[in-house]
Amino acid sequence: MPYYLGIDIGTSASKGVLIDAECRIVAQASCQHETENPRDGWYQHDAEAIWWGDFCRLSRELIERASIEASQIRCVGLSALGCDCVPVDEDCHALAPAILYGVDARSKPQIDELLSEYGSDRARELFGHDPCSSDIAPKVLWFKENMPEVHERAAKFLTASSYLCAKLTGRFTIDRYLAEDFLPLYDRETWRVNERGCARFCRPDQMAEVMAATDIAGVITDRAADETGLAKGTPVLVGTGDSGAEAISTGVFCPGDMMVQLGSTAYFIYLADHMVDDARLWPGTFIIPGTYGICAGTNTAGALTAWLRRELYRDAVDAERSGGPDAYEVMARDAGQVGPGADGLLCLPYFAGERTPLNDPEARGVFFGLTERHTRGHMVRAALEGIAYTVAAHVDIIERDHGLPIEHIMLVGGGTKNPVWMQAIADVCGREVSVAKVTVGACFGDALMAALAGGAYSSWGELARVLGVAQTIEPDMDAHELYASRRHIFDELYARNCDLMHELV
């Protein structure tokens, strides 16, 4: 029987699945890792230890758990956190820690420099939007200005998925979906290296070859087979970013579909049949031919609940270690005992700056309205509602500002384990949201793409028919009215305090 492997490397955890030709999961595995935060605003990974190390561990564990021969795996799909940057040598050895996505603000001086040099209009023309911390070109420029020897020595500047593909196949590639984050280093019309665009940042030969995410980049090499346990010669997909793979995992295939990914951060992908121009968002090419992804992302989601767990629920964490209930379940229970609106407590969830729609890496988190009657459960509730407000802000931009219909909102990621959070999103947005039948995330999307590329399915439409919805959450319209009445306070809190936030940095 043929099997298809999908592995995703995330911010704080990596996951993998093996599926059969009917998209049934036959084995799954995960492992945790730490994100380095050596300075305020710096977030980085050791690519060799985390990205490659996790991939090798998971591939071996999945083969063992499924009790299959490696040769039964027909195709390998992969994804990883996007908008990151690691310089590598000719053998794909990392030359420096990988700079992570928008949460890493070290390239802000380069972004400011580019905006000053080009002006906003020209910068938007080059980057597709106002340059921000999720763009990779400013990160490349950071290496050039701060680690010039590494910059000069680098054979390629890669994202995590490109790095993994190169380790597996020996070929340096990147898919079109992630290549958008490298603008203006690629030409969006031809997807070839833009030599003029590279001039300010790097050599043209330091860029990877652009392909489709579902293209076969190559096959498992001898060395990769030894390290991963996979069979030599197994086809490997180019791969893509975790958010794109996560959207695929939920069945977000058609214009009008929207994915809300609740992981360490929140990420949104709305599928459209045409490109839009909006400096607040990240519109670009999507994985599926003929579709465009209006993408957006916050800097905190699960990372904020993890902070609350760590700082306010140490007793629950200790109890969990001793065999008690999961600390996150305790937090959800406490939040559920607090009514909508958290008794007047609001949270601005900008604990690591903010990406869309604010594009402000110096934004800061706020709990507003605290009184003696508020408990830690109120703070959890307010944090979940604060993230729900950011979801609603993106829904409004898509529907009200661009007149695009949102037919379905699919929730995915670790946040779907929290019923209070899902209900808050439905209530703040005032619309139903659904949870995919399979919620293991991007690794499942990777396996689906491997099944498609490996011949188990002939089209995206055929693949869509085997996926489904596990749960639909209807909004409480009374709660929606309460949230709507306080929306202006949430918005004004940032607008009136952003200058003070910047003074603190």
PLM features: residue spans?
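Active-site core segments that coordinate phosphate-bearing ligands/cofactors
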Residues: 5-6, 115-128, 138-173, 180-201, ...
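A conserved helix-loop-beta module that forms one wall/lid of the active-site cleft
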Residues: 202-214
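Short alpha-helix plus adjacent loop in nuclease-associated cores
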Residues: 100-117, 447-448
